[in-house]
């Protein structure tokens, strides 16, 4: 009997992209195009949050002129810390807080990881010149100063990681407190300093922490830094969200498609009195409800009814009997802008009095103005009918030719029927006399010319003249 007589097929494990660590997922998404990020962001909530962070990283960090290595290193480590508890990512996302934007603000405020290139070049050249005369004294001074800067950045890096770890612990306790339906007092553990959410230590600035605290070894479980800051999610003060491009660039990823994660949003009918009452309360439930109401109020879109476009679409061919044509010439009152007082020019009044003597100056009467507009519409209709008729086209072409011929002889252009002017023809008689005869255009050419002679003038001159 062979060893491989029976082969048992083991079921394949489910493999998903979300099973990878967060820092590795962030690096993978950083190599994708914008269209691919949008498609991945529509799959689940976790990938949508990472795609949003990647967009902020491209816009704020990569597009900036400062050094970005410090922000990038801290960001990768923060994602590594959040990988153990991904519920904290959803908490940050529910409050529209961006990790990349927050780290970038800290880096800009305290100028972490920024080295002035001009200053570095000048100091290097000075050391190169003076080292030949005075040895390497300047070089030693530079070497003594460099560890100070590196230590300061390392302390900031470690403090941020421990603050994130502290936030994860508070987030877990908040979830457990809400699920157990207990009051705001937490279960006491090894850290006897923290008894409740509002029993945290007093707020201190980052520079004071760097001065007061000696160098310490980072601890993965507990941290004294950043317990309660003004920007913290569970702070007793009013929430302060990031005024960054975070709310603008997440327009494509606002809709979550993860069925397991449901965002709790309060109703829009809550009054401002309840918000004031929740601000004065010290309970964890009231604080969480207050944050949800404030975020819902800030991020709630305005519900406005879509109004129909008042602009009318022009059809390919308009006629006098078409309803669209009437709307263009005389639009209805609901489309026209509402004006409290209408100013009418003096020239317009004189023109109305000249065309309509019985108008009696009733310019403020809307019925009179409407009557004038209806008369104009009738004139436009007749003009369009006349221009579109086939007989009128031939008449207008003939009139144009006649006007062109008369323009060389007479500067006056008459609007009425052109006058057929009589022409005289010079005729030489047998006695070498010149006489003028009138030529009628309407008569046939074969008729007797002697019957149409009106006037005969004797020149009494020779033919040679």
Curated annotation (Swiss-Prot):
Keywords, comma-separated and alphabetical: Mitochondrion
Residue spans of biased composition, Basic and acidic residues class: 254-263
Family matches, as InterPro entries: F-box-like_dom_sf, F-box_dom, SCF_F-box/WD-repeat
Family annotation (SUPFAM superfamilies): F-box domain
GO biological process per UniProt: intracellular distribution of mitochondria; mitochondrion organization; SCF-dependent proteasomal ubiquitin-dependent protein catabolic process
Location of the region described as Disordered in the Swiss-Prot/TrEMBL record: 253-279
Protein's cellular compartments: Mitochondrion
Superkingdom: Eukaryota
Biased composition (Polar residues): 265-275
PROSITE patterns tied to this protein: FBOX
Residue stretches spanning the membrane: none
GO cellular component: a single term: mitochondrion
Domain F-box, residue spans: 14-60
Pfam families in the cross-refs: F-box-like (PF12937)
Other comments on record: Present with 1360 molecules/cell in log phase SD medium.
PANTHER family: DACTYLIN (PTHR14381), F-BOX_WD REPEAT-CONTAINING PROTEIN 4 (PTHR14381:SF1)
The name this protein goes by in its record: Mitochondrial F-box protein MFB1
Gene name tied to this protein: MFB1
């Amino acid at each position: 009997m062979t060893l491989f007589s029976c082969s048992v097929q083991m079921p394949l494990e489910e493999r998903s992209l979300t099973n990878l660590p967060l820092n590795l997922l962030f690096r993978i998404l950083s190599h994708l195009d914008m269209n691919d990020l949008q498609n991945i962001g529509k799959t689940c909530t976790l990938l949508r949050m990472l795609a949003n962070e990647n967009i902020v990283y491209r816009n704020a960090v990569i597009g900036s002129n400062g050094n970005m290595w410090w922000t990038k290193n801290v960001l990768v480590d923060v994602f590594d810390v959040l990988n153990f508890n991904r519920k904290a990512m959803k908490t940050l996302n529910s409050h529209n807080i961006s990790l990349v934007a927050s780290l970038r603000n800290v880096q800009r405020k305290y100028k972490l990881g920024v080295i002035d290139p001009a200053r570095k070049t000048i100091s290097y050249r000075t050391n190169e010149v003076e080292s030949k005369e005075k040895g390497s004294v300047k070089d030693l001074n530079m070497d003594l100063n460099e560890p100070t800067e590196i230590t300061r950045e390392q302390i900031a890096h470690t403090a941020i990681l421990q603050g994130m770890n502290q936030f994860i612990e508070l987030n877990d306790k908040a979830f457990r407190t809400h699920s157990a339906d207990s009051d705001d007092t937490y279960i006491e553990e090894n850290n006897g300093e923290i008894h409740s959410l509002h029993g945290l230590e007093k707020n201190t600035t980052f520079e004071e922490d760097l001065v007061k605290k000696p160098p310490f070894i980072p601890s993965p479980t507990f941290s004294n830094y950043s317990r309660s800051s003004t920007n913290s999610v569970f702070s007793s003060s009013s929430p302060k969200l990031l005024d960054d491009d975070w709310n603008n660039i997440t327009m494509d990823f606002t809709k979550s498609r993860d069925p397991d994660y449901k965002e709790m949003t309060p109703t829009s009918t809550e009054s401002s009195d309840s918000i004031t009452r929740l601000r004065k309360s010290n309970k964890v439930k009231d604080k969480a409800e207050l944050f949800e109401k404030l975020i819902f109020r800030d991020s709630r879109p305005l519900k406005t009814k879509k109004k129909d476009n008042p602009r009318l679409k022009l059809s390919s061919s308009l006629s006098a009997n078409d309803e669209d044509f009437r709307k263009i010439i005389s639009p209805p009152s609901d489309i026209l802008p509402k004006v409290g007082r209408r100013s009418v020019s003096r020239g317009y009044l004189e023109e109305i009095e000249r065309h309509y003597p019985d108008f009696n100056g009733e310019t403020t009467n809307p019925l009179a103005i409407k009557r004038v507009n209806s008369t104009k519409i009738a004139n436009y209709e007749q003009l369009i009918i006349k221009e579109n008729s086939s007989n009128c086209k031939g008449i207008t072409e003939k009139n144009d030719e006649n006007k062109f011929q008369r323009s060389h002889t007479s500067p006056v252009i008459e609007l009425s029927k052109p006058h057929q002017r009589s022409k005289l023809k010079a005729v030489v008689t047998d006695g070498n006399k010149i006489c003028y005869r009138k030529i009628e255009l309407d008569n046939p050419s074969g008729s007797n010319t002697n019957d149409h002679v009106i006037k005969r003038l004797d020149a009494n001159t020779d033919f040679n003249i």
